[in-house]
Every structure is written in structure tokens, then in C-alpha cells.
Amino acid sequence: MTAIPITRSSIAPERQQLIRQSVRSAAAIMTEADNSRLAQADDAHIFHAFLSDPDIHAPIYTLPRPLNVDAVRAFIADHLAQRERGEGLLFLNFDASGAISGYVDIVIWPQWAAGELGGAVGKARQGQRRGIEGARRGFDWMFDVLGLDLICETAALDNIRTAKLLDGLGFRRRGEILSEREDGTTRPSLVWEVTRSEWDAYHRR
């Protein structure tokens, strides 16, 4: 059983179905400027090329290992199946030239009206306010479009950039867990959470 979210508040089956349907209906995620769409099987080569930069893939424990085109294709197929169940989404973001500028990997726990947003942005966007603004828009979208009550995030203990981002966006630190990769290896991770009401108050929505 997953170690996250830490906070688990069960919701009515009818509301769970509404969340699942919102996930199944999602075709793009709100971004600051880039175009977004669902990842498809024929994106495997370009997505693999984007992920091949160690600075992008190394910190992300949810990516397949070894990281090759076939593994990326299977990763996309798994997320399309998750979407059909109403439990996950994988979006690719594209810049004005049509190149991948980032991706968004969303896990949904409909039974708790909770979710986790992961992914990465290309080097051109790293270290800029655009990355922070993009994360904020993504969290807004999860609350507003998917109808979630809670967002839970994790990061490696030495991932200072993500820690600063989450702290600065109003998330609460909830402790440490042992995250497990698909290949069975593990890493310690810090955990943050924020409820919809906390998010709305912090960002004056």
C-alpha cells in the first residue's frame, strides 16, 4: 500500500466517481505559456530524448529504469491505462517551436480526493519564476478541475529546489517516508501536504 498521502479522509462513492470522470475527461493541463496535451504512444522517442538529460531524469524516482525508448513507451501506456481508471495522467508540454519543454505526471487517489503532481521542466525553464508559476497553476488545476481536497508532494532529502518551491507555495512538511521505484530500489523522501482550504487561504483565491 502506498505510504502517501499521510492525510486520508474517505469520501462518498459518488464523489469518487466524479473525480475519476474528471480525470478521464482531462486532455490538457493549465500552463503559463506552453501547449499541453496527453502523452501518446508515438511520443516515446521525443519524450525519451527529453528525459535522457541526467539533470532531468536523475532526481525523479518514478521514471522507469533503465531509461530507454521501450521503457518510456510502456510508461506512457501505463499512464493511459491509469487515465481510463481515473487514477493518473501524463501530459507533455511543448514550447512555441514544438519542442518538449516539460512533462507533468499526476497520481490520483479518488478514495481520498487526493493527488500528487510530479514531472520536470527543461533547462531553459529551470531557476526561473516561470517554473514556480507553472507549479502554482498546476496545483490550482488539480483543485479546480479534478475536484481534489488534498495535494501531497514528495522530494529527495537533498532536492533543495523542490523543497524551497513547496515551502514557498504554502505546503506543510509532514515528515519522511521511504519511496520505492518500479525496480524495487528505494530512497528516503520528504513529504509535504496542502488542503484545498489551506491553498485557497494562502493564495487568497
Predicted regions and their residues:
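Acyl-donor (CoA/ACP) binding surface of acyl/acetyltransferases
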Residues: M1-D55, N93-R205
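Hydrophobic residues in alpha-helical segments
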Residues: L51, I60, R83-E84
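Secondary-structure boundary/capping residues
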Residues: I56, R65, R85-G88, I151
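Short, hydrophobic secondary-structure boundary micro-motifs
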Residues: A58-I60, G88, A201-H203
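A generic membrane alpha-helix/interface feature
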Residues: Y61, A71-R73, G86, A120, ...
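A short helix-loop-beta-strand connector motif used in the catalytic cores of GNAT acetyltransferases and
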Residues: D78-L92
